[in-house]
């Protein structure tokens, strides 16, 4: 169905270079004609809403620190009220697409814009404003010294041209996008499930190697670690504090511009998405290191996330290949000589579930690895030469799995990119979806993606 989409039959000039030609029966109005500021406060009884690039506007969980690290003040009386259907914009991150329609009555940060939005179909309006061409234009309408401090202004956004198809066309576009997003999301979920299965296979291989070694015939002994059981007799068991040096970090003042945009990589949890840290999103200056609580750690250090909502599921660890600074949610480890850092990272990945239970404080409102638990953890330590042998053996056994995971992750990236381009083409009138929308049934259809999960699971064996 998607492949059969064609342009509209007639177009006209939009009056905007970045929008180009638009369907001849669509209107173009400046955003100022469609929005009116909505000012209401002092409703702390309403649910707290937040805005994110990926989600749009959503009800914020007060217990899940992984959603947002911003501190919630005790007094919410000054928070703005957003009524269901209002347009909410995070003015400091509009250039990233952090905007959307409020799904229910709630309250938002005083730093957000809240507007009444006079458009026939608010779901269409949301899809339009969050599309790639419009997000880029909101960036142009923002002021600031550097990207991270861009601030959307009312003056800048008032003249943004808004495309207005007839109400029936808006409804058709929304219906088609809901269907196509559902189909693409189904394919993405199928690939994610296969990645999960592959990661489980990989973890089994790692766990066996770091807890029993490579030779199944060696005699065993009790480890003295309740969750671990027996280990090879010639391995030692030592507390981590006797084998590692630990270093924490901090955040230089965001208000001091002389601390930021320097040459020193500053690692925070958002950088910990790979096993090797070569660079970071944020950089700081030497002055920031000298005048704040952050610390420099040498190249070759093992970096670990110790405070983040992601610790509900996994323990991100990575090795730095350059000197870096850390924020307060990170910790670095350097070896005293008997425990190879690459091997210890492998041990963490192989025993992640058990270590999460050992290292995190049960009942804490913010997921964090307690240093006392971490430093006093008993770990089995093979001779240093055997550690390298285990690393080499595991790398060889898991290489085909790693390759398969990378392939599926790349396919997910391509599907997301395709979805982004499809939405942009549909909401800006490059593709006519009216006929396609008429053919859609009200119930969820599976069509060409219905067998994805089965096909992908069968593909696992072929990938290994």
Segments and roles (model prediction):
Residues 14-15, 29-84, 241-256, 270-299, ...:
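Sequence-specific dsDNA recognition surfaces
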Residues 9-44, 159, 167, 171, ...:
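Non-catalytic DNA-recognition/assembly elements of restriction-modification systems
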Residues 10-14, 91-92, 106-111, 146-171, ...:
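A short glycine-rich beta-alpha junction/loop motif
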Residues 120-125, 338-343, 388:
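Short, conserved charged micro-motifs
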Residues 1-19, 25, 165-218, 378-464:
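Amphipathic alpha-helical coiled-coil/heptad-repeat segments
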Residues 47, 53-68, 87-111, 127, ...:
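Short, ligand-facing micro-motifs at secondary-structure edges
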